[in-house]
Amino acid sequence: MTEAATSLKRTLVGRVVSNKMDKTVTVLIENRVKHPLYGKYVVRSKKYHAHDEANQYNEGDKVEITESRPLSRTKSWVVSRLLEAARVI
């Protein structure tokens, strides 16, 4: 596989909000967009299901997810790496 082929896959950064499923985590992605009329920045969010082969990511972890082929009906992203572990209280 060439470098050009790997750079076409989208990557997103977000927080794990659920890890209750087997080999799947739910990742919340938040984007700040400017309102077209009022100019105020609004936080838009979306949840993605991502594949976690080893069940190693916990709630609160900051992760990077990469687009992949569809793995199930709702899952077409794979957790590529851990950016920041969640703080334990």
Curated annotation (Swiss-Prot):
GO molecular-function term, one example from the UniProt record: structural constituent of ribosome
Function: One of the primary rRNA binding proteins, it binds specifically to the 5'-end of 16S ribosomal RNA.
Family statement: Belongs to the universal ribosomal protein uS17 family.
Gene Ontology annotations of biological process type: translation
Gene3D superfamilies associated with the record: Nucleic acid-binding proteins
Keywords: Ribonucleoprotein, Ribosomal protein, RNA-binding, rRNA-binding
Identification of the protein by name: Small ribosomal subunit protein uS17
Top-level taxon of origin: Bacteria
Pfam families hit by this protein: Ribosomal_S17
PANTHER family to which the protein is assigned, alphabetical: 40S RIBOSOMAL PROTEIN S11 FAMILY MEMBER, SMALL RIBOSOMAL SUBUNIT PROTEIN US17M
GO cellular component: cytosolic small ribosomal subunit
Annotated CDD domains: Ribosomal_uS17
Subunit structure: Part of the 30S ribosomal subunit.
HAMAP family referenced in this protein's UniProt entry, alphabetically: Ribosomal_uS17_B
